[in-house]
Amino acid sequence: MIGQGAGNVKAGWRRPADWGYIDGLSTPKRAARLIVTDFPHAIREIEHLWIPLADGTRLAARIWLPEDADRKPVPAVLEYLPYRKRTGTFERDALTHPYLAGHGYAAVRVDIRGSGESDGLLFDEYALQEQDDALEVIAWLAAQPWCSGAVGMMGISWGGFNGLQVAARRPPALKAIITLCSTDDRYRDDVHYMGGALLRAGFGWASFLFGAMCYPPDPALVGESWRATWLNRLQNLPLFLEIWLSHQRRDAYWQHGSVCEDYHAIQCPVFAVSGWTDGYTNAIPRLLAHLAAPRKALIGPWAHAYPHVALPGPQIGFLQEALRWWDHWLKDIDTGVMDEPMLRAWMTESVPPAPFHHDLPGRWVAEPAWPPPGITPHRLHLTDTGLQTTAATLTPRAVCSSLTVGKDGGSWCPFGSGPDQAGDQQGDDAQSLLFETSPLDTRAEILGAPVVTLDVASDKPLANLAVRLCDVHPDGTSLRISYGILNLAYRDGNESPALLQPGVRYRIRVQLNDAGSAFPSGHRIRLALSTNYWPMIWPSPDNPTVTVFGGTVDLPIRPAETSDALLPALPEPETATPERTTPLRPGVVRIDRLGLELGTEGNFRVHIDPGDPLSAVVEMRQSQTVSRDNWRTRFETTTRLFCTRDAFNLQAAMCAWEADVEVCRRTWNTSVPREFI
């Protein structure tokens, strides 16, 4: 039995590594930064304001703006999220939005319909209603007397997604966006599926969102209507995972909100940002290659967090860089930002493998365009003597991996807040099919997506293949540089899966995640193939044997560029003053300014019997409290996913209390057919 599991979660620190995917609400405590208190503009804060919509719904907003904005209007920068400005994103909001306001912007945090203090109901992520509401919000902002009429959108993860999606709707007042840790393709590169395989992280994300939507609005802001709003949400709470499991291929559901369907719909300038440790990096090269609008990109070493607070470091002065972008596009100030290379990326040095890195050494490199003309594929061939630069014989080799291969793979979307990154790959490598080079004579650096092409056959109609590119150190330790997943039923694309014919050879192509990494001389480049990668992906119903008859690896080798050394240094990280909180007891924290007490605890468990792929199960439990003085609420959620050969089975429960009185209890027990998974 392989178990990953259980950890307590403390309020304001909501992401144990094993929870897989939680849309980073908090700020890593170990990220050093300069706290700025003296700004060019005095700041006025509007704690709570209603934005009216045409259908009568009101969205709740919190706004920071210069004190004199009514006399000297300023551009607005919108962050539009479902994570509760009051009790969810308060920590990172305090660091970011006053900083923007102090430099001459109206920074606006709006709760999406059905979340936080806003009216209405939320039924799914990235719904058309969410976009329609955003269009009204932007028009409302542009019309305010304190706004110059120019609006930008900035957000990470969900807020990065909807920034791209709303930009594609072309609201006239939206002049530019900054999108962080997002994707242009909701099926190909989001938390739900990877290469047609079901990601375990999608369960963690669905379970987190299931609990997050149970939070009540604050009576101090909305008055006595809080209870009716809360009960209405609880009684209409959707089971998100059931929705997402009902779309196991790239159909119209996933095409909605995927801006890759029409890149040219986006006409405003785009600044795309992510980190190599994050799960959301692959969209950036595609956005650079396919957008027609002005665009820039920045890829650092970071996990899933804003670059001024993210780990692994080094952090940068992201807020200063954001201001340069906004000043250029929202204030028509020539900051020189568009004179710089299209892409700046962190070239990561080789490090000992570990599930947590506080910092990743490296240097900044830059490319004037993407695809970069100076990067060409360097081809290696799979042969009987390993990876070679010339083609040679490969005796067919079979692999049928243990169901426990992948235990050192880390989370699909690391947050850098704990041991959630890939560790030493030697254990997984020992149960995989390996091809590797001799020790390198010279250093090699890659920038972009490695591509692996294989001729394979399976003895079962369904099979997964995990492909890992590793840096093997002289001491034998193995550092994962990149990886890709392919459910072989999806060999011809994500829209039209087809069962394999056992014994028939197929040529498959696996594009690995984009990477920026160095292989030092004396190290070896290793390709590792396995038919399982648990608990990152759900196993096939039968444990297949896949035979490899031949193949190649194309590495995007980047030559040394002397111009890299001439890049101007990025500024050191700065933020506004953090929100003051007081830990009261394990798992409970008080927001001092509001007197609100937030409690969070829970656990997450994954299990598989090494001899039975149908034994896979994931479970998550959350218990959360929100209280102030005599007002007390509590809500608990549980979710469980398991399977048969033909179906995914999903069990869930939610119970909520006001004080000690139960006010709502619901249960779900549903089954979704397995389709080519």
Question: For each predicted feature, which ranges?
Answer:
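N-terminal cap/lid segment of alpha/beta-hydrolase-fold proteins
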Residues: 33-69, 436-442, 455, 496
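Accessory cap/linker subdomain of secreted extracellular hydrolases
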Residues: 93-94, 102, 168-265
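Short beta-strand/loop motif that positions the catalytic acidic residue
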Residues: 266, 272-274
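Short terminal hydrophobic/aromatic SLiMs and anchors at protein ends
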Residues: 1-2, 9
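C-terminal, loop-rich substrate-recognition/catalytic regions characterized by aromatic stacking residues
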Residues: 298, 308, 312-657, 661-677
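Cap/lid segment of the alpha/beta-hydrolase catalytic domain
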Residues: 68-142, 191-192, 461, 470-474
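Glycine-rich nucleophile elbow surrounding the catalytic serine of serine-hydrolase chemistry
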Residues: 156-165
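Alpha/beta-hydrolase fold nucleophile elbow
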Residues: 145-157
